[in-house]
Amino acid sequence: MRRPGAPMRVVAELEYVKGRRIGASQGQNSEVHLSHDPQIGGVVVVKELDKARIPDPTRYFAEAHAMFAAAHPNVVPIKYACQTPGVIALVMPYYPIGSLADRIADDPLSPCAAIRMGLDTLVGVRAIHSNGLLHLDIKPSNVLFDSANRALVADFGQSEVLGPGGVVTGLRMYDRAIPPECFLHGAAIVATDLYQVGLTLYRAVNGDRWFNSQQPSDLRSAVISGDFPDRNAFAPHVPSRLRTVIRQALDKDHTTRIPTATAFIDALTQIAVSIDWRQSTVGPGHVRWTGTPLGRAGLEVDLAPNGSRYDVTIHTVTSTARRAKQQAALWKSDMTNRKAYDHLNKVFRVLS
């Protein structure tokens, strides 16, 4: 007979109706589906982990444990976890607004939006670190947005408990997000997550078309040498101070990298953005930047193709008119693409 108050094991029955697969390009050992949970009567996201790919049964619920331990408003929560004979199922809220990867597939975030996303992500990462964990898979597809446009860190499939001396070994990381120390030493530290946040910010301010155009023939060597990603290649409207902070987070030497999430947060909060330029693709080869200086008419900067060459023009924009901005030194035509971007760097320095 069980004595009163003694623990009692309960085996409950849970079910979910699996719907369409989402994030099909993400994760080699799992599938994520939009699903319906009849117990709570709503839409959820279910991540199914193949038990056959988890050789140690004691690790079946390791990802669920990490998500629960790192509970924070800037971390995607876990509702519950369960299992079938073949899979471990992690049940999470559905965020219909989508991920950072969705937002930057074509064009980048504005500087202010990128800074807000970075701050939210770092607050979540700080909570993860304070619970003795490394995330090890911070990238645009793992940054989701809630209905308040707050960024949350998702997917703890690669996370690990910090070992003795604050080091994690036995890594299973996404190759284009692997920091130099992981290639060199096969080990990760707190600075590893901060590098990945820096890389995520780099992608956010430049857009993934820009990032994905960088294809080094030897990724390992390019990462170790600091040539990938190209720290000098930024979209021309990105403020110089934001570029500096991102470079500090991407320092190839982890001992001189931004040391903590708190220090990274402090660096981002000190950045002043005078004009929050928004970049958009107007047509093939035609890019437009739109910004509104405080108390003044809006500005539009255009990079437009002219045959095989490029022109840069600047206009002021009001609710009723679009007029050429008369700064002859800033208008320029008949340039190569490279020369046009060099000129755009000058344009944004002058206008901002």
Feature roles, as predicted:
Residues 53-69:
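AlphaC helix of the eukaryotic protein kinase fold
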Residues 80-82:
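A short, aromatic-enriched beta-strand patch in the conserved N-lobe beta-sheet
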Residues 85-99, 103:
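Conserved short submotifs of the Hanks-type protein kinase catalytic core
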Residues 117-118:
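Activation segment signature within eukaryotic-like protein kinase domains
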Residues 129-145:
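Catalytic-loop of the protein kinase fold
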Residues 167-182:
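Conserved activation segment of eukaryotic-like protein kinases, specifically the C-terminal portion
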Residues 252-275:
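Terminal C-lobe "cap" of eukaryotic-type protein kinase domains
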